[in-house]
Amino acid sequence: MAFVMIREAKEGDCGNILRLIRELAEYEKLSDQVKISEEALRADGFGETPFYHCLVAEILSAPGEPQGPCVVGYGLYYFSYSTWKGRNIYLEDIYVKPEYRGQGIGSKIIKKVAEVALDKGCSQLRLAVLDWNKRAMDLYKALGAQDLTEAEGWHCFRFEGEAMRELAGK
């Protein structure tokens, strides 16, 4: 029987995090969207002023089992600000490898992010999910999250690439 530990990611975890980011993108049918590199993850998450923070779910083998520690999931988050509520935390990604789902690992990651949010004085933990990912939506609702599209009618938008350059006049 393996044990799961949720811990803060270290710079040396960036290769595993990138692998899991790619797996998540594949699962979401958006693998062509991943442009990030391991070097960028290192620079952006472990420099003097990190743009993100990350937790990893690591399987630790039980005594006598041959397999060593193995990263099987992650939660990548950053801090944001609401003009209505103040400090927020945004969970950009949460992913658990398929063979480890249904064991409470995703819940543990989300709960740990919630602990960080409260410790930092955040009033909200926000995240987004694709509309077809019912399993994830059911988990978030079971943990107490509110679906803002249903409840308040919010839609997410983004400016990217050429649209952002054009908007900025560059």
UniProtKB/Swiss-Prot annotation:
Reaction catalysed by this enzyme: S-(2-aminoethyl)-L-cysteine + acetyl-CoA = S-(2-acetamidoethyl)-L-cysteine + CoA + H(+); an alkane-alpha,omega-diamine + acetyl-CoA = an N-acetylalkane-alpha,omega-diamine + CoA + H(+)
Binding-site list for substrate: 27-28, 92, 152
Positions bearing N6-acetyllysine: 29
Source organism superkingdom: Eukaryota
Ranges annotated as spanning the membrane: none
Main localization category: cytoplasm
GO terms of molecular function: N-acetyltransferase activity
CDD domains listed in its UniProt record: NAT_SF
Residue span, N-acetyltransferase domain: 4-166
Keyword vocabulary terms for this entry: Acetylation, Acyltransferase, Cytoplasm, Transferase
One GO cellular component term noted in the UniProt record for this chain: cytoplasm
EC number: 2.3.1.-, 2.3.1.57
UniProt-annotated binding residues for acetyl-CoA: 94-96, 102-107, 133-135, 140
Record localization: Cytoplasm
Enzyme class: transferase
Annotated catalytic residues: 140
Subunit structure: Homodimer.
Family statement: Belongs to the acetyltransferase family.
Purpose of the protein: Catalyzes the N-acetylation of the amino acid thialysine (S-(2-aminoethyl)-L-cysteine), a L-lysine analog with the 4-methylene group substituted with a sulfur. May also catalyze acetylation of polyamines, such as norspermidine, spermidine or spermine. However, ability to acetylate polyamines is weak, suggesting that it does not act as a diamine acetyltransferase in vivo.
Designated name of the protein: Thialysine N-epsilon-acetyltransferase
Organism per entry: Bos taurus
